[in-house]
UniProtKB/Swiss-Prot annotation:
Residues 28-75 bind DNA. It is found in: Nucleus. Gene3D superfamilies: DM DNA-binding domain. This is Doublesex- and mab-3-related transcription factor 3a. The lineage of its organism: Eukaryota, Metazoa, Chordata, Craniata, Vertebrata. The keyword Cell inner membrane does not apply. The gene is dmrt3a.
């Protein structure tokens, strides 16, 4: 009890003290000064000592003046704090210039002062303030018609009177409503004055290769981020923008940075055209005919039907089964490398789900990057034009297997087993010496 009893006994004291004044009935202070107990509610206009000028009653009048001045000061401070908070909450975007805001804030402040003066009337004298306070203390039935102050015995007794009487809470909601109505009326012309100008448009300076994006001023903070992305990037599909926004966790600035960085990486390569159909698979199923046009090579060497176009293993399974390959080659082509490719086809499963549908943005970027690097490898090794024997060697190379073996290789590689796929690239009747030779040595011997 000694270790734990004293804190609980100490904390129990202040809790029991505020409960007692809440249960007492407010009494008239002037009558109490003269030895009479009278209930305060409805008593002000009938008090027999309301015109008394004794020392105790004069002291009560002075206390009422002090309390009325304090109440008026607190109301004014609350009004000023409310005026300073509401315009700051309307400033949502970070890049707004301050010059136009200050010009519109000055008439707004003067309007607030005018409205406050008209609501409160002329400045009151301390006697009027004390009368108003005493009218609030007297109760709802008094009506506040009499201007004579009512006596309160002490500040300790006046505080419970302020808390218990219902009239003290009545003027404050009216003032709050007038303040909110004033703030609404002041905030209404703000978008009207800012929208037709569009001069202080904020700029989001995004670090990236493509520069910055200027957001229009009409995009306020209450707009959903998806609508903002649709207005900034109208060429992108809404489903793509929604997925990018979900990947960023709803962060609008992060989604804009990702879209800008993806656009800046694809601009120098000229992989995707500016139209929206660049993300849709063409009707004939040839995905990589457009990116090959960015290379300044003659069409005779790099035509669609040549031996060095994009291999069929990078195409969809519907195309490989349909046999759409034009040109002199009737069998599907493979790379001339016996080793497994540097970039395995890990995206084939994700792309073959919707075989004729649109691509996702990141898949197309990574897909085209793989294709371009493989084309650079092919160009670096097969730059000299091939004559009849060289083309015949490549066409009759044992690396070019039949279509069932290609399907077997694709299915094995989808199961991420590159070792078996490497062995299936050779024919069954091939010698071990031919297998040990690398593709580079065979190509050099053939070209020489």
């Amino acid at each position: 009890m000694n270790g734990y009893g004293s804190p609980y006994l100490y904390m129990g004291g202040p809790v029991s003290q505020p409960r007692a004044p809440l249960q007492r009935t407010p009494k008239c202070a002037r009558c109490r000064n003269h030895g009479v107990l009278s209930w305060l509610k409805g008593h002000k206009r009938y008090c027999r000592f309301k015109d008394c000028t004794c020392e105790k009653c004069i002291l009560i009048i002075e206390r009422q003046r002090v309390m009325a001045a304090q109440v008026a000061l607190r109301r004014q401070q609350a009004n000023e704090s409310l005026e300073s908070l509401i315009p700051e909450s309307l400033r949502a975007l970070p890049g707004i210039t301050v010059s136009s805001g200050e010009q519109s804030a000055n008439p707004r402040a003067s309007d607030i002062d005018l409205r406050w003066n008209t609501e409160t009337g002329t400045p009151k004298t301390p006697q009027d303030l004390s009368d108003e306070l005493s009218g609030e203390q007297s109760g709802g039935e008094n009506g506040g018609s009499d201007r004579e102050p009512e006596a309160v015995s002490s500040p300790e007794e006046s505080k419970p009177n302020l808390c218990c009487t219902p009239d003290t809470s009545d003027p404050s909601p009216q003032l709050e409503e007038s303040r909110f109505g004033l703030s609404k009326s002041c905030s209404d012309p703000e978008p009207k004055s800012d929208n037709p100008k569009y001069s202080p448009e904020p700029n989001l300076l995004i670090e990236g290769l493509s520069g910055s994006v200027s957001l229009p001023f009409s995009l306020r903070a209450n707009r959903p981020p998806l609508e903002v992305l649709k207005k900034i990037f109208p060429a992108h599909k809404p489903a793509v923008l929604e997925l990018i926004l979900k990947g960023c966790g709803g962060d609008l600035v992060g989604a804009i940075e990702i879209l800008l960085s993806s656009r800046s990486t694809m601009k120098p390569e000229k992989i995707l055209s500016e139209s929206s159909d660049a993300l849709v698979l063409p009707s004939n199923g040839h995905l990589f005919e457009h990116p090959l046009s960015s290379y300044p090579v003659s069409s005779s060497k790099w035509s669609v039907g040549s031996a060095f176009r994009v291999p069929d293993s990078l195409r969809f399974s519907s195309e490989s089964s349909g046999g759409v390959v034009p040109g002199p080659l009737s069998m599907p082509l493979q790379h001339g490398f016996p080793q497994p490719p540097r970039y395995p086809l890990m995206l084939r499963n994700s792309l073959s789900r919707g075989q004729a549908g649109p691509f996702m943005h990141n898949d197309v970027t990574l897909w085209n990057t793989m294709t371009l690097q493989q084309q650079y490898q092919l160009r670096s090794q097969y730059v000299p034009p091939f004559s009849g024997p060289s083309a015949g060697v490549i066409r009759s190379s044992p690396l070019l297997t039949s279509r069932p073996s290609e399907e077997h290789r694709i299915s094995i590689q989808e199961e991420s087993c590159p070792v078996i796929a490497k062995q299936s690239m050779y024919a069954a009747d091939e010698e071990y010496d031919d297998r040990s030779d690398s593709s580079d040595s065979r190509i050099l011997n053939t070209s020489s």
